Every structure is written in C-alpha cells, then in structure tokens.
Amino acid sequence: MSLTINNDSAIGFALNALRRSSSLMNEAMERLSTGKRINRASDDPAGIHRVIRLNAEIRGINTASRNAADGQSLVDTLDTSLSEVQSILLRMRELTIQAMSDTNSADDRLALDSELSQLELEITRIGSTTSFGGKPVFDGNTHYLQIGPRSGNTLEVQSYTLSAATLGLNQDLTSRGNAENYLGIIDTAIQNINEKRGAAGALSNRLDFIMSSLDNSKVNLSLIHI
C-alpha cells in the first residue's frame, strides 16, 4: 500500500512552517534590538502586567523629574528677585545714613527722600510682577510640587507677599530723627530678606537631592530585566 501526499498540502505545511520560523526569528531579533524579553502581550501574557507597571513607574518618575526641575526654576526666579530687593535695601541704607548727618540741608533731605520713595516703589513692583509660568511668585499661597510617581509624593512650597509695606518700609528722611528710626527698620528688612534667601537656598539644595534620587530610581528600574 503506497502513501500519496497531496502537493498542495505539502506546500501549505511548508509555508506555515516557514512563516512560523520567520515569526520566531523576528521576535528573537526584536528582543536583541530592544534588550527586552517582552515587547508585546503575546510574548508573555502574565508578565505583560509587570511590564506595564514598570513602564508606568518610569514614566511617572520622568514627569516628577520635570516637576522638580520646574520647582528649581521657580526657586531660582524667587531668589533672583530677592537678590534685587537686597541690593535696593542696601542702597536705601546708604541714603538713610547720609540723611542722618546734620550737614544736610532741608532740600538735601528732600532729594534723598525722593530717591528713597522710588526705591520703595521698585520693591513693591518686584513683588507684584515677579512670576513663573504665568503665575505670581509672591502671592502668599502654598504651592505644591508633585515630586514622585505616587499620590502623596508632594512638596509644599509656602510663598509670601513682598512689598515695601510688608517689609515695614514706610518712613521718610525729612528729619534726622526719622532717618535714625528708619535705619533700624531697614536693617530688619535686610535680615528678613537674608532669611528668605537662606530658605530659598535650602529648598534649592533639597530639590537637587530629589532630582538626583529620581534619576537613580529611573536607572534602577530600567535595569530590571523584562
């Protein structure tokens, strides 16, 4: 008894085997090129859930890193404005010391007071116009930075209002007594700004550490073999 094989069936079997072999080869090449064992759900239906979780974690970390970088830029903007105010206060202190001398005439003191008034206005202008991302920086509100991939990974940044009035700068230099009183007020304002700049510097350092930690977490997750 002889066995007869239909030519069409033989060709079909051969083509299917060739397609399967080609598909396996393509999958192997894809794994080599991507360095990943799982590139699609069919590669490992159970393992794909782990891949999705890891990818979500990495993408969340990437977003958190951008948020932290934005926070760093916000702090830089704030500190730049405080530095300007600090310079203005030092100039105001010079004017006040000059006005304390009785060698000044009444007109001299009026001229000194006029410059002082303009500097007070400039401090208020800086406080009201400094912004980041279209939002005011010195608004007295609490700003939240999402610095991690999970709920609760937030950093609170407490803002404050900044103006000549909030710094207590409301004295004139039309008399020696006024100038003498104002010197103490200005020194207090300078100390206030120094403390705010110190806090900004500490926050900037913390954000640096946060960004470094996020980068390390991303690298560690990327090394997980999937």
What function would you assign to each model-found segment?
Residues 1-224:
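Primary detection of the long, small/polar-rich alpha-helical "axial" segments characteristic
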